[in-house]
Amino acid sequence: MICEEAYHQQPQIQKEQMMTMDQRNNHQRKRSPLSSPSSPSSPSSPSSPKSPSFNNNEEERLEVVNLSGMALESLPNPSLNLAQICKLDLSNNHLQTIPESLTARLLNLIALDVHSNQIKALPNSIGCLSKLKTLNVSGNFLVSFPKSIQHCRSLEELNANFNKLIRLPDSIGFELTNLRKLSINSNKLISLPISITHLTSLRVLDARLNCLMILPDDLENLINLEILNVSQNFQYLSALPSSIGLLMNLIELDVSYNKITVLPESIGCMRRLRKLSVEGNPLVSPPIEVMEQNLQVVREYLTQKMNGGSPRSPSKKKSWGFGKLVKYGTFNGGSRSWNREEREGFIMPEYRSIDSLASPRYSGMFSPRRLFSPRTYFSR
């Protein structure tokens, strides 16, 4: 078992040190680099909630540990029982690895944030985090996930934006059935595993800014999906599967800045769809005079075509397109305005290139990893 092996990798002297520290904590809690700054004399403090009793029928205090932005290159020895930590923030440091022995002992961890570090691989013992609900590993150098991540069956949000991922585990969708939000934008993914269509709890899938060449065929199995963003795969993504129109709960679909020439006729069946973004594609069907109209007109055109009819195009109006690269195509299904929070942080039509942020003028002021990896997971 990975968890047991990782635990026994600890040097004996460190185990004795941990036992001594835990005994001290029975009498008084001491501040340390890995302890919460809250005082034991204030049990109502928001950083020290009481937890339900554990198997030993003793109430223990669950801790929120924040070591963000401390320029850490390695982790200090903990001075409290690691099983007491429920939220751990190690973001914005210089960490290159996460010790196997650390994750193996974080038995009650529900949120782990290591974004904006230099981590190249996650430990295999990540699979020991059976209670983990939120994992933010964005802004690192990950090429792949360990297969053991499939054992994090409580996981609800996974943020792996701004890495170097070239693939996801083949079985990731078979095990992470509680996953509600998957953010994997700004990587090097060529395809998504077929098992991803088994994520029946998934509500948000953000796979923009990759190298996706194809999407899985059985997308209709994502019965709760509300937001799908596969934009800005540029010359790689040239077609959408017809099953995309069977996503009956989809509200927002962004396929902008790809190489798509034909929209599937099944999109006409998407009655809950309120926003469709297709700008930056060399679309041929529907024709430009249809795409210049509202979403309802586009839906009716595709429905008529699917039913074998001969859809009539609206009278041609002034084009917003430039050559074959169409700039039209973001349709709102209603008059309601969508604020940035409701868009889940996606890059919408007001997209601007982040290349300019690399200029000397902005050196040290902005980091794309930090800009697109907001620390929102540790609000209580």
From Swiss-Prot:
Residues 33-56 have a biased composition (Low complexity). Residues 9-23 have a biased composition (Polar residues). LRR repeats lie at residues 59-82, 83-105, 107-129, 130-152, 154-176, 177-199, 201-222, 223-247, 248-271, 273-293. It holds the Pfam family LRR_8. A motif (GVYW) lies at residues 298-301. Residues 1-57 are annotated as: Disordered. It comes from the Eukaryota. Keywords: Leucine-rich repeat, Repeat. The keyword Cytoplasm does not apply. Widely expressed. Leucine-rich repeat protein that likely mediates protein interactions, possibly in the context of signal transduction. Belongs to the SHOC2 family. This is Plant intracellular Ras-group-related LRR protein 6.
